[in-house]
């Protein structure tokens, strides 16, 4: 049984690709490759970017003296697949087909497994994904939406949620599988989940309009009023979707999505900016309160992760509203590279079985 591994992890983002190299648990190398928006606009579909992104990251590794022949596995960020349980999955043909055809939606995360597989095949080593955003451990009662034909879906920042939960459990000196936690991931999308003894039994779907509004997403809205608003404005379903997930939130209210501009306006105590940011904090706090009822009020900790350092005003506003529920822990930044490496190491060492999609 292999106990050691040098692992390449690949994290595609909207206008960047972040890569990391690990020797077992040791973080050897990290680089974020920025992609020019104009360059990416040449590609009709997100999946058309695979060769370009692969070439740029391999070129970067070569420039930085990283010998790719030493890798024992490649791990890509998981994408939009059919609902699956958490764990480490080997990349296979069915997974690649679903990602390449956008069978369950088009998103930049779909590139992760495809790029990882392409690199791995050239090196004759395995490719994996870990805890993709479609991890579905929701209890059956949480799936009921109110419309029989529409079931709630689990789409969220599963990888960082789970990693933040594990970090919190270490701080509390307990096993993650023994705790009840509420985890909040703050990024371009915000997702809030109820972690019940290792299972994420309910979570806001940050991609399809649940939870609080975000930088450019609407969050939950009055549906009937939105339908009346859009009936004369939108011709295609894509227009409706664009309004919900790319033209609303802070971008819609403040006409900017630049955190520096927003922070400057907060320092100036601009009344409109302050009101909108207070509303964002209010909505986040309200969802946290909702998740506490999912856990019957038995909450061992409330855990924040993601871009929390960019939202000091919002964080303070949220914490004053929810710190009566449980102790608050904050783990700034994105720990997804470490989480992917950990998931692959566990498989390499035989600590957990590799899962097969679907």
From Swiss-Prot:
Tell me the keywords, alphabetical order: ATP-binding, Cytoplasm, Kinase, Nucleotide-binding, Transferase
Q: What class of enzyme is it?
A: transferase
Report if keyword Kinase is assigned. Answer: yes
Q: Which GO terms describe its cellular component?
A: cytoplasm
| UniProt subcellular location | Cytoplasm
Keyword flag Glycosyltransferase:
no
One Pfam family, short name: Acetate_kinase
Identify the gene encoding this protein: buk
- The entry's protein name is Probable butyrate kinase
One record GO biological process = acetate metabolic process
Q: What is catalyzed by this enzyme?
A: butanoate + ATP = butanoyl phosphate + ADP
Q: What is its main location?
A: cytoplasm
Family per record: Belongs to the acetokinase family.
Enzyme Commission code: 2.7.2.7
Q: Which organism is it from?
A: Oceanobacillus iheyensis (strain DSM 14371 / CIP 107618 / JCM 11309 / KCTC 3954 / HTE831)
Paired cysteines (S-S): none
Please give the Gene Ontology molecular function terms for this protein. acetate kinase activity; ATP binding; butyrate kinase activity
Highest taxon of the source? Bacteria
């Amino acid at each position: 049984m292999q106990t050691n591994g040098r692992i390449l992890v690949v994290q595609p983002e909207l206008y960047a690709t972040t890569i990391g190299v690990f020797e077992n648990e040791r973080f050897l190398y990290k680089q974020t490759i920025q992609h020019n928006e104009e360059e990416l606009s040449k590609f009709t579909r997100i999946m058309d970017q695979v060769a370009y992104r692969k070439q740029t990251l391999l070129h970067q590794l070569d420039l930085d003296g990283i010998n790719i022949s030493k890798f024992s596995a490649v791990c890509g960020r998981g994408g939009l697949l059919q609902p699956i349980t958490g764990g480490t999955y080997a990349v296979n043909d069915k997974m690649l087909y679903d990602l390449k055809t956008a069978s369950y939606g088009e998103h930049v995360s779909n590139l992760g497994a495809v790029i990882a597989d392409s690199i791995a095949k050239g090196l004759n080593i395995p490719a994996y994904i870990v805890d993709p955003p479609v991890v579905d451990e929701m209890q059956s009662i949480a799936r009921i939406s109110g419309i029989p034909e529409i079931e709630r879906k689990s789409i969220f920042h599963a990888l960082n949620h789970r990693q933040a939960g594990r970090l919190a459990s270490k701080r509390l000196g307990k096993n993650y599988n023994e705790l009840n936690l509420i985890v909040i991931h703050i990024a371009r999308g915000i997702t809030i989940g109820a972690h019940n003894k290792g299972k994420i039994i309910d979570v806001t779907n940050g991609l399809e309009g649940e939870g609080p509004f975000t930088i450019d997403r609407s969050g939950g809205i009055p549906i009937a009023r939105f339908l009346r608003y859009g009936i004369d404005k939108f011709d295609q379903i894509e227009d409706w979707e664009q309004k919900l997930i790319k033209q609303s939130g802070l971008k819609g209210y403040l006409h900017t999505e630049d955190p520096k501009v927003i922070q400057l306006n907060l320092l100036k105590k601009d009344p409109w900016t302050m009101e909108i940011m207070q509303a964002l904090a209010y909505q986040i706090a309200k969802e946290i309160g909702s998740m506490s009822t999912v856990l019957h009020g038995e909450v061992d900790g409330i855990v924040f992760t993601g871009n929390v350092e960019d939202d000091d005003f919002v964080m303070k506003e949220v914490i004053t509203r929810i710190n009566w529920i449980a102790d608050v822990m904050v783990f700034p930044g994105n720990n997804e590279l470490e989480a992917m490496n950990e998931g692959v190491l566990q498989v390499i060492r035989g600590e957990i079985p590799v899962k097969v999609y679907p």
